């Protein structure tokens, strides 16, 4: 039986203590709903004095596509103006935006990874709240891919951008509320932060082991297994010549290209004996994104054991094999493509998008293979695991 869980938005008694009688601004998006499937925005507008909305990326109801310019618009249902806080000249609200606000509420579904934009957004929001002396209330949600497994590379302290920041691993194993506590405590942000915790969730639980229905945190993350794969397979977004399955019904589960020898790839992957996952060679034709309307030869990744599967090591192993098989066909995506947000200065300066995703160029330049890279970052992951413990809210 699914475990009964209450998200932060369901903890009305706790919200009343920090929101009643105050002018409230709301940061939210599609997929953020309460136990009765009512949008967070509508719950808050009905109960509190909501005066303003902040649009993160996809609109306050998930009604925009990624990259659409939405500096300001009116939400039809509430009549409230939504201001973009994720745009070219700033990330986070400006002083002008918060001058008539007493408290900001944040409730957005995230993906449990460093490179999912909402992680960077909540950190930037905390900085802005600290600078403008506006309290922030985070309505916590389940960590969708559990809170026990940490994976991947760890950002260097000098790196600051929307896909890598705060010495985080690729798979962070924190809820959004725990992450906010971690950043505030470890990096001295100074945000007046309140986290309304989840009730009933434990760290080893995946999202679909609870009674909370899965609503898309972004258009491509359509189920828990896709989200698990994304924690490593996001690396494929950094290779322009390989489709990661966008434009199909199985994003990240499918990887391929018109030139790929999929049968040989599957044979080589079987030799690697990667845990918790199996592969089938398949044909697919994306309707959009890379190789749109072209027949692709590829693989389908099928998770057989979530607790054993390590998508980060798996994804980079797949890339290793493809580079050996088709070195002339690997084309890395330029670092500037797809970015609509001005970023803080980032050191080291990368020219390939995959390097920003991985927080290093050691893999794309061939200095390290998948296993070497994974092993190299093991000590940094262990340090992170120890650091984050004091900010965890759940056992």
Which residues does each PLM region occupy?
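Conserved anion/nucleotide-ligand pocket segment
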Residues: 159-232
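Short internal beta-strands
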Residues: 51-57, 139
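Glycine-rich, aromatic-lined ligand/substrate-binding cores of catalytic
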Residues: 201-291
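Glycine/threonine-rich flexible loop motifs
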Residues: 110-122
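Glycine-rich oxoanion-binding loops at beta->alpha junctions
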Residues: 69-101, 113
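Glycine-rich, charge-decorated loop segments at or immediately adjacent to ligand/cofactor-binding or catalytic sites
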Residues: 63-66, 137-159
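Conserved functional hotspot residues or short segments at active or partner-binding sites
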Residues: 256-376
